[in-house]
């Protein structure tokens, strides 16, 4: 993992601020070629060009899922923008990303991108672009969230791993170096057949991902990752989860040295 810090950016709070700015500030036309803040679905900052300089990656668009009981109402975009990272701190005040700050604009309408992250998943020392997409797969002909990983080479996305799915359908996943070995793992919130949820940890194994361990079933509705509480990495990894139906907060502890969850 090189010159990277994915800030696990949980976008909603920042996007709410952007929306309020759009509503209450005097409206001026968005400059030609710029991208409105209201069209930002997801963003993160990380070095994806292996030059030691971070970029701002943005999913932009206006789609909304309507045909999925688990993901109904969630947004997806049409474009991946690779931008000057200096603009990240000004997104809420500017109301848009200036055209001159956009290095590349990549059309991803065909795979309905929902979330973008950056991390080194295979230990090659280069950060991959992780995109959660909403689409069918060759051997799984239903619309579902799927984790896709790419290298960014001269403005083009080169596939690294286009997984049909994880072990189970998932609500969300983040990249996090759970065992502090310099390589990022997938941490996902997944559906059980009984309607419950578990948190599962995956690591890269040659040509794909393998489950390291998982939590016991979580008790509570709509768990989500807690980005406000620091997570711990190492032989003992700690991951925080919040629930939408209460102020309940769970700190999950994984003993990775003994491979026990």
Residue spans of the language-model regions?
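Beta-propeller-forming repeat regions
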Residues: 4-261
């Amino acid at each position: 993992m090189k010159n990277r810090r994915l800030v696990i950016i949980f976008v909603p709070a920042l996007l709410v601020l952007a929306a309020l700015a759009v509503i209450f500030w005097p409206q001026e036309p968005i400059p030609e070629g710029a991208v409105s803040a209201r069209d930002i679905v997801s963003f993160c900052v990380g070095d994806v060009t292996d030059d030691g300089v971070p970029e701002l990656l943005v999913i932009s668009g206006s789609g909304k899922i309507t045909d999925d009981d688990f993901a109904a109402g969630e947004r997806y975009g049409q474009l991946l923008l690779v931008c000057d990272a200096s603009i990240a701190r000004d997104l809420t005040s500017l109301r848009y990303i200036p055209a001159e700050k956009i290095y590349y604009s990549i059309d991803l309408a065909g795979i309905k991108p929902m979330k973008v992250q950056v991390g080194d998943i295979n230990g090659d020392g280069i950060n991959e672009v992780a995109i959660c997409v909403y689409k069918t797969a060759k051997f799984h002909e239903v619309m579902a969230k799927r984790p896709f990983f790419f290298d960014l080479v001269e403005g083009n996305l080169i596939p690294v791993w286009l997984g049909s799915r994880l072990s189970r359908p998932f609500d969300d996943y983040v990249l996090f170096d759970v065992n502090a070995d310099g390589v990022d793992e997938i941490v996902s919130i997944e559906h059980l057949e009984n309607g419950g949820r578990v948190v599962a940890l995956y690591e890269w194994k040659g040509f794909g991902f393998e489950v390291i361990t998982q939590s016991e079933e979580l008790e509570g509705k709509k768990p989500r990752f807690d980005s406000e509480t620091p997570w711990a990495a190492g032989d003992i990894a700690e991951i925080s989860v919040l629930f939408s139906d209460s102020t309940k907060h769970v700190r999950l502890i994984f003993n990775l040295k003994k491979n026990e969850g």
